[in-house]
Amino acid sequence: MSLSTEAKAKILADFGRCENDSGSTEVQVALLTAQINHLQGHFKTHIHDHHSRRGLLRMVSARRKLTAYLKRTDNARYTALIQKLGLRR
């Protein structure tokens, strides 16, 4: 249920600060968002997959913590990221 290498490379290119950036907050949030969106489609067909649902909730929690950190430290980057990803906040 993980993302393909090509999908990860595209996210790194879109959200990274430089070509080797794979750990910035924006990249981490973008990767988590892609994984969350992928799992949401999985749960439409596998309603009773509670084990994977727990993993989804962990990802949502991690994304929420990372976005809160980004909002606290650099509000301009936070706003740009939220608009680019289309998140609700």
From Swiss-Prot:
User: What is an annotated GO biological process for this record, any one?
Assistant: translation
Q: Which GO terms describe its cellular component?
A: cytosolic small ribosomal subunit
For this protein, the record's Pfam families field holds: Ribosomal_S15
Under Gene3D superfamilies, the record lists: 6.10.250.3130, S15/NS1, RNA-binding (1.10.287.10)
Q: Which domain of life is it from?
A: Bacteria
Family under the similarity heading? Belongs to the universal ribosomal protein uS15 family.
Oligomeric and partner information: Part of the 30S ribosomal subunit. Forms a bridge to the 50S subunit in the 70S ribosome, contacting the 23S rRNA.
Could you identify this protein by its name? Small ribosomal subunit protein uS15
The gene behind this protein is rpsO
